[in-house]
Every structure is written in structure tokens, then in C-alpha cells.
Amino acid sequence: MSMKILTVDDSRTMRDMLRLALTTAGYRVVQAVDGMEGLEVLEREVPDLVITDINMPKLDGYGFIEGARKTDRFRVVPILVLTTESDPEKKRRARNAGATGWIVKPFDPAKLVDVIRRVAA
């Protein structure tokens, strides 16, 4: 059974790129367009790993991560932040919210899959 990954990003292009990279690597992908929808999909789909953007409407990535970590069954699910941001303070804020790792866009599909394999092991 392949790993199920939830991607949360308001950019349709980025969601499409993630879906292509992840399905090509053999993962099942479910998607959400912002943090609010992300929390709904998280509860419904119960993914093995999450990849989220930070800057999104309705509920940003920090709020999404904090919301996910409030639920016992999602406290240990790896959450990777995939964003254009590289500011150390934003990275620290994401870690404090409960993020597992940080990847800067644009991403290399092979490196993304490598990171997923490492954090999901």
C-alpha cells in the first residue's frame, strides 16, 4: 500500500507540479487549496505525510500546522513546509508550530522524494 500525501497550496500550478512529482514516485496524493480546507481533508483522508505552503488565504500554513497538531492522531504525522520563504524567523515559527522540515520553492522532485523518504522512515 503506497503512502498517502496531503498537499496544501493555494497555487493550482504548484498543486499540479506536486501531484505529478509525487504520483510519479508512487505516492497517492490528496489536495487542499488552503489551510481551512487542509484541516478538513486531513480529518477525512488521514494522510501519512503533509506538504504545506505558508502563504495562503483563509488559513495560512502556520495556522494549518497548529490546527493539525492539536489532534492527537496528527501529532506525529510529518509535516513539510514547501514555500518561497527562506527567512530564519519564519522557519523557527514553523518549527514551533510543529513542522517537521522546510523546503524552498522551486523544488527538485528527486530531492523532495528523498526528503519524504527520510522523514517518513
Predicted features and spans:
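Active-site beta3 strand of CheY-like receiver
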Residues: E45-I51
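Active-site residues of response regulator receiver
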Residues: D53, T83
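Short hydrophobic/Thr-rich beta-strand motif most characteristic of the beta2 strand and flanking loop
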Residues: G26-V33, V41
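Short, glycine/charged-rich "phosphate-handling" switch motifs in NTP-dependent
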Residues: T100
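Receiver (REC) domain active-site loop signature in two-component systems and cognate sites
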Residues: M56
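C-terminal output helix
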Residues: F107-I116
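Conserved acidic segment of CheY-like receiver
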Residues: S2-T13, L18-L22, V50
